[in-house]
Amino acid sequence: MPSWNIHAAHAERLLREEKTDTLGIRDIGNFLFGNFLPDLYVGWMVPDVSHKLPYGMTHMAETATIPVPQYQKFWDLYIEGKNPSEVTDIVLGAWAHLVCDAGYNGATRRYIAEIGVKPGDRTRIRKQKDFELYGRTFFLGRRVPLTPSLIDECAAFPQYPILAEDVECGVKAADVLLDGNNERHLADAPTYSLLTPEFFRMTGDRVDEILRQGLLRFGKAAC
């Protein structure tokens, strides 16, 4: 559910507040692209990729109206117990993406149930509009450079291979999103339809803490 502007904002905040070596991150650009990667083949953010893969597969999520990715399963499969030197920045970024989706999607499911709103098209539209507004409250400053290292790490992504042509499409899509988001940046807090500023603040803080603790633990093992 979070768009790439929200994923980028969490990644940028983490990189502002922590040193990359303490997080185990070696290439910032590759890590940033990893934060977009699970959406690449779903087709929503980058419609012109070579082929499509289902959200449930790329995000390790069961089919549901608001799916919640299993980020711990991804960690256990591709990070835990591995030689840190063999865990790429793309993999770390992809894990961060799943944390973000799981945090916001899970919180949204709970919130909707608590206030007694029934799932449906009207609820979906209200929810999507709120997330679109929330994403525009962030001003984004980092771009993903298209480098041989990025192409190589994507080709070696352990969950499924990423074609070079699709990496290029993804980088271009990220640039377009960043430019558009900054052009339409909201300096003042927006008025939401379904969710609330407190919902986004609390959920964002929880996501940040999971990201920080997980990557600090990885970075300590990598030292």
Language model regions located:
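N-terminal leader/auxiliary helical segments
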Residues: 1-223
